[in-house]
């Protein structure tokens, strides 16, 4: 059952170990492999600098190897398959060569190089190392500028990452901190704490209390991805609805790259609002639009059922904007016999049983 992440925080843990894993079946192994312990999985640039030069700090007991997930943008989306195959081969060679920490990085992104989506690269490498029987010999650390939100971290952890450095998010925090009256250290600490709380909440929904149990568990469901694509790069993830595949996913990354580096000179230094969190006229679509909110407010102020019906139509009829799976479906009414309204309990009677804690009560 789910865990209450606040009241039951005592049984939760974000501790992560980076590096080789001990053989759980070898009860006589008195010298298990050394691992790096981190109290939470979000790493700063200073932490990454130590990992990049970990051999010098540990007399060669740990050795790290970078895996660059970028490739020339002029290869287009067609270059992604060969690049992933090359990354997988490099990873296996590195493990067999004695490296026990692999750093998946997109820092080489430039005008001429585009990055493979970091979740795709991480999951592909994680799966390939498992299939080659060497996954427990190495730790996976992600260094990416595309990781920002809690769910980004949760997905990476769920598909094999042991720690993540969101370097662009951290750089953004440091640039914004003085404007908010914060020190850079406080801003970063607040962000790390917030992501940690979010990860605990995500795990708690599935009844998982420790990050070590959540890592690599792949407790997700894919929506809008092709079955063969998911089977190849996200093995074990259910996908009940078809959709786009590898090349379409990479084409979106290429399009974003070209939009970023091909920006109008007059817009230099400015970023489009995007509208991911708050509605914008030229941004991402939202279910809650200004029109819908106005209709709802007017219906309650004027006690107008007609206005409420207009609001309900905007929310319920999703076939026009097709933002959800429900918007792609239709009710099967052929051969159905409607129930007479006289046999249905009136709405006025139903709402009397409504309570604020109804969902908690069950």
Residue ranges, per PLM feature:
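Well-ordered alpha-helical segments embedded in enzymatic catalytic cores
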Residues: 86-90, 121-124
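Short, ordered loop/turn segments at secondary-structure junctions
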Residues: 107-109, 145, 161, 168-173
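Flexible, glycine-rich loop/tail regions that form catalytic "lids" or insertion modules at the edges
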Residues: 1-83, 90, 94, 98-101, ...
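Alpha-helix-loop-beta-strand connector modules within alpha/beta enzyme cores
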Residues: 114-142, 190-197, 201
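Conserved, mostly hydrophobic/aromatic
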Residues: 106, 125, 156, 210
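Catalytic cores of alpha/beta
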Residues: 146-160
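Conserved short loop/turn motifs at secondary-structure junctions
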Residues: 105-114, 139-146, 356-361
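Active-site-adjacent beta->alpha loops and helix N-cap segments on the catalytic face
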Residues: 111-124, 172-182
């Amino acid at each position: 059952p789910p865990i209450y992440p606040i009241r039951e925080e005592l049984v939760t843990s974000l501790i992560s170990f980076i590096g080789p894993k001990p053989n759980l079946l070898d009860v006589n192994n008195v010298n298990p492999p050394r691992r790096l312990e981190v109290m939470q999985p979000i790493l700063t640039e200073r932490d990454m600098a130590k990992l990049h030069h970990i051999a010098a700090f540990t007399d060669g007991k740990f050795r790290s190897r970078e895996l660059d997930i970028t490739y020339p943008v002029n290869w287009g989306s067609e270059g992604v398959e060969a690049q992933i195959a090359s990354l997988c081969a490099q990873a296996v060679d590195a493990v067999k060569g004695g490296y026990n920490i692999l750093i998946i990085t997109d820092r080489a992104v430039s005008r001429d190089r585009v990055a493979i989506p970091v979740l795709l690269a991480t999951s592909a490498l994680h799966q390939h190392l498992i299939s080659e029987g060497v996954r427990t010999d190495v730790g996976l650390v992600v260094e990416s500028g595309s990781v920002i939100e809690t769910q980004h971290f949760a997905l990476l952890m769920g598909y094999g990452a042991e720690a993540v450095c969101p370097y662009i998010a951290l750089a953004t925090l440091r640039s914004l901190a003085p404007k908010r009256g914060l020190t850079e250290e406080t801003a970063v600490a607040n962000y790390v704490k917030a992501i940690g709380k979010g990860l605990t909440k995500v795990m708690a929904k599935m009844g998982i209390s420790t990050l070590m149990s959540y890592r690599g568990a792949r407790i997700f469901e894919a929506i809008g991805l092709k079955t063969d694509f998911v089977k190849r790069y996200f093995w074990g993830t259910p996908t009940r609805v078809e959709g786009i595949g590898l090349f379409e996913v990479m084409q979106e990354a290429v399009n974003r790259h070209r939009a970023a580096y091909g920006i109008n000179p007059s817009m230099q230094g400015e970023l489009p609002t995007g509208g991911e969190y708050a509605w914008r006229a030229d941004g991402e679509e939202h279910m809650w639009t200004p029109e819908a909110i106005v209709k709802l407010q007017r219906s309650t102020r004027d006690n107008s059922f007609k206005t409420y019906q207009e609001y309900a139509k905007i929310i319920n009829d999703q076939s026009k904007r097709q933002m959800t799976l429900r918007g792609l479906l239709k009710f099967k009414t052929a051969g159905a016999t409607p129930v007479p309204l006289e046999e249905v309990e009136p709405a006025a009677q139903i709402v009397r049983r409504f309570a604020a804690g109804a969902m908690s009560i069950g």
